[in-house]
């Protein structure tokens, strides 16, 4: 059944009419419909929930003549089920009973009070603690894309204007949003294929004028000039869609979203999607976090510090002043030993960033206030530890920590030491905070003494020794007497409940007291909830200052973490140079050295204006890929302000890092391994500059020998002579080792290995010059290839080598390649390249077509 079809509602029961009407308003998400102690799902929602959550699918009678498929979950277990759903990209509308069942005529009044989507989560139980939870929107213009991300759990709002599809792909890889909004006419759906939470939105939600009005209203400004984003038209359209979506789902004000930042690619080293993937920065090739750069560098004290570190890793700085400011701060923390006590103090702060977001949305829980109270109480001690530091960047961060004595004192007075998880049952507001609340609680809490006295008095009056006075939530207060003695009860005892061996009674006196106590409990709880809401009003005026405190604490955490990692892992402070180049002495791969069972062999690299390309040769498993990756990772670490695994490192200006390392079939896009390889190569050749660091590994291996050799040769030549990029070019084509003899700035290096009889020992040491051979058969033997196959391969190798020596003039394949004449100029192609089709009339275009036919 199509549950959003409301044309024939009259044939359904009143309750199902209510359900179907609400479902029509939330047709693209599951509707959790509260019925007593359960959330129920019906029709297609029930079937889908049963499939996704593994819960039973049943039926609830009939409505409109048809059985109603139904599934349900207990209300007290809802958070666990919500967590499962949002992890797979599913959104949920939660419909609660807001009317009183006792007074309702017909179905109890219900209302959707909360919408849970993957990208708008703020509940601590549903969020990944150490990962940003980004909602994104993308809008495609005639030229380029607008991209916006918003972390509702922190208030961080960022936009970017992107010129190309490749830039958008890189941003998607960098930000890794959990939910993406896109317009109806978005033309690059292939880029979104592997994201779970995709939402197609109507075109009007991306309207420019509407977007501007939404943003101005949100920030309370007359224009957007102060944010430096007035000309970012496409990304502002995406940002407007985000704001509309968040307002629709949160259904409250969003005061913690009070600024918007423009991400400018020119401010950071550009890392394309392939590079982020190949270097395994925050996610390994299997999709996990183990054995990534982030896993090695992250020993932060707080979750908010961990999230900031990952953003830094994906956004290495280009401005040397910003990098040096971080380095200076880390150096001082290290030399003074301040990082050790600072780490412990920050650990006690908790995740203030997300707590402040929940406060702003008024969804904070009692324990959030208790954690904020603890964080504020730690501020004097934290500032005392930092007072010995003089690095300008650290001093600036300390200024943002602020002082909040009034807010701390308020929370000390208002919240009990160990509050319950929820406000709904009371027990959150401390005794002495409000006199009226204390009075109502006194009436309720005095009930125990009263009941003890009543029980003793009634036993004495009636002579019934089995008499007890008790209470439960269903029947209230009662006097309980055994069945054997029930005939002795006085006439004023009114039977309330009959059990197997007991009778329960109520008296007019006990009934009157019950009403008084229950009334006081209800009034105490209502007043406590009112005082709870007032706490939000008293804390929120300091929202912006508390957010600044959270950001400063997170950055201090990252810097302190860098100091600890440098000390623990033996890292040194890299030197920044104005001259193009990368000089690393005894560099180590930061990840491999941590997981390797044997001592890591450190290696150098030298790249500069006169030495721009290294042709890297050596056996498989010899360490070529590890060597190349470590150069890129050390360079990246230097640009986030982190110390690096080396004895010495001098790093010049870098604008981009490219890696073409490893490849596999892209089945989703229908691209072969070779096609993926060539696409990545084309991206490098089009976008690399003289300030780029390029890693190229085994170009051309996915095609025939001569095709592959030709492509590898030409790519290396183009990088060396046309672009002049700093390049590590690993290859098994030994013909490429002749390049240094033919081109300036190109040098050979190789990974050493020692052969002994039929075995090989990998030395993993980088040496100048070309490798003597590839040792392919020995590696195959180590891998367990059968001895018969190895023997046959040796025989075939001898035949091939013998034949090669007999070739005419003993020319190498590359000499043959170089001897080929330059292709003749094609007049038709020359003519075509000179044409601007936008300037042609239809008649001119037709005449030109005939001329091109003649020239060809």
Swiss-Prot record:
Protein keywords: ATP-binding, DNA damage, DNA repair, DNA-binding, Nucleotide-binding
GO terms under biological process: mismatch repair
Classification via Pfam families: MutS_I (PF01624), MutS_II (PF05188), MutS_III (PF05192), MutS_IV (PF05190), MutS_V (PF00488)
Residues annotated for ATP binding in this entry: 618-625
Coiled coil region boundaries: none
GO molecular-function term, one example from the UniProt record: ATP binding
GO cellular component, one term: cytosol
Task performed by this protein: This protein is involved in the repair of mismatches in DNA. It is possible that it carries out the mismatch recognition step. This protein has a weak ATPase activity.
Similarity comment text for this entry: Belongs to the DNA mismatch repair MutS family.
Protein name: DNA mismatch repair protein MutS
Gene name linked to the record: mutS
């Amino acid at each position: 059944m199509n549950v959003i079809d409301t044309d024939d509602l009259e044939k359904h029961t009143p309750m199902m009419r209510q359900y179907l009407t609400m479902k029509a308003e939330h047709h693209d998400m599951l509707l959790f419909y509260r019925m007593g102690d359960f959330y129920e799902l019906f029709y297609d929602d029930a079937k889908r929930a049963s499939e996704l959550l593994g819960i039973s699918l049943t039926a609830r009678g009939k409505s409109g003549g048809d059985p109603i498929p139904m599934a349900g979950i207990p209300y007290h277990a809802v958070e666990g089920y919500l967590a499962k759903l949002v992890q797979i990209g599913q959104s949920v509308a939660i419909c609660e009973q807001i009317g009183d069942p006792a007074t309702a005529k017909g179905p109890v009044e219900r209302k959707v009070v909360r919408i849970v989507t993957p990208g708008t989560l703020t509940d601590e139980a549903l969020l990944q603690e150490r990962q940003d939870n980004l909602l994104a929107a993308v809008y495609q213009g005639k030229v380029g894309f607008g991209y916006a991300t918003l972390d509702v759990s922190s208030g961080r709002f960022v936009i970017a204007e992107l010129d190309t599809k490749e830039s958008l792909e890189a941003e998607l890889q960098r930000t890794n949003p959990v939910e993406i909004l896109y317009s109806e006419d978005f033309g690059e759906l292939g880029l979104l294929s592997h994201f779970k939470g995709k939402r197609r939105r109507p075109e009007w939600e991306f309207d420019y004028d509407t977007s501007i009005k939404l943003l101005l209203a949100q920030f309370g400004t007359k224009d957007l000039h102060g944010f430096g984003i007035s000309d970012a038209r496409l990304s502002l359209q995406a940002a407007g869609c985000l704001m509309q979506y968040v307002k629709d789902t949160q259904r409250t004000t969003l005061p913690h979203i009070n600024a918007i930042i423009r991400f400018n690619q020119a401010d950071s080293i550009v890392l394309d999607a392939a590079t982020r993937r190949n270097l395994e920065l925050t996610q390994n090739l299997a999709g996990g976090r183990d054995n990534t750069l982030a896993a090695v560098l992250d020993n932060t004290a707080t979750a908010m510090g961990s999230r900031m570190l990952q953003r830094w890793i994906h956004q290495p700085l280009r401005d040397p002043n910003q990098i040096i400011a971080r380095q200076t701060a880390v150096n001082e923390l290290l030399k003074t030993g301040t990082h050790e006590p600072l780490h412990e103090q920050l650990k006690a702060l908790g995740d203030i960033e997300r707590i402040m977001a929940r406060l702003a949305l008024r969804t904070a829980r009692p324990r959030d206030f208790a954690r904020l109270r603890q964080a504020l109480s730690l501020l004097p001690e934290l500032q005392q530890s930092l007072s010995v530091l003089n690095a300008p960047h650290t001093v600036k961060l300390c200024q943002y920590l602020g002082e909040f004595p009034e807010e701390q004192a308020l929370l000390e007075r208002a919240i009990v030491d160990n509050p319950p998880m929820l406000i709904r049952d009371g027990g959150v507001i401390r005794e002495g905070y409000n006199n009226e609340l204390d009075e109502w609680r006194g009436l309720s809490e005095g009930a125990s003494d009263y009941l003890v006295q009543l029980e003793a008095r009634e036993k004495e009056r009636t002579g019934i020794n089995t008499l007890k006075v008790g209470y439960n939530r269903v029947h209230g207060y009662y006097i309980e007497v055994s069945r054997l003695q029930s005939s002795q009860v006085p006439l004023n005892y009114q039977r309330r409940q009959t059990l197997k061996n007991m009778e329960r009674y109520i008296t007019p006196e006990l009934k009157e007291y019950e009403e008084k106590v229950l009334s006081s409990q209800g009034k105490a709880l209502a007043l406590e909830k009112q005082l709870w809401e007032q706490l939000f009003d008293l804390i929120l005026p300091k929202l912006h200052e508390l957010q600044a405190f959270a950001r400063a604490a997170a950055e201090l955490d990252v810097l302190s973490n860098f100091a600890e990692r440098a000390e623990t892992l033996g890292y040194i402070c890299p030197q920044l140079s104005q001259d193009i180049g990368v000089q690393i002495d005894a560099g180590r791969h930061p990840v491999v050295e941590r997981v390797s069972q044997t001592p890591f062999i450190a290696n150098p690299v030298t790249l500069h204006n006169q030495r721009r390309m290294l042709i890297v040769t050596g056996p498989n498993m010899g360490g070529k890929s590890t060597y190349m990756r470590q150069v890129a990772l050390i360079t990246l670490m230097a640009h986030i302000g982190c110390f690096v695994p080396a004895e010495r490192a001098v790093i010049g200006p870098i604008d981009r890092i490219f890696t073409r390392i490893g490849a596999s079939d892209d089945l989703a896009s229908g691209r072969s391994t070779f096609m993926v390889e060539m696409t990545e190569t084309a991206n490098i050749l089009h976008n690399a500059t003289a300030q780029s660091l390029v890693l190229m590994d085994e170009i051309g291996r996915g095609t025939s020998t001569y095709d592959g050799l030709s492509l590898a040769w030409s790519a290396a030549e183009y990088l060396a002579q046309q672009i002049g990029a700093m390049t590590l070019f690993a290859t098994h084509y030994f013909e490429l080792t002749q390049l240094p003899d033919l081109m300036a700035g190109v040098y050979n290096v190789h990974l050493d290995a020692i052969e002994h009889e039929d075995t090989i020992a990998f030395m993993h040491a980088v040496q100048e010059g070309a490798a003597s051979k590839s040792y392919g058969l020995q590696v195959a033997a180590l891998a367990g290839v059968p001895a018969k196959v190895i023997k046959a391969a040796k025989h075939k190798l001898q035949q091939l080598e013998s034949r090669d020596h007999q070739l005419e003039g003993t020319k190498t394949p590359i000499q043959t390649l170089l001897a080929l004449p330059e292709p003749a100029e094609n007049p038709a192609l020359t003519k075509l390249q000179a044409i601007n089709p936008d300037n042609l009339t239809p008649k001119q275009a037709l005449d030109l077509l005939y001329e091109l036919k003649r020239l060809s």
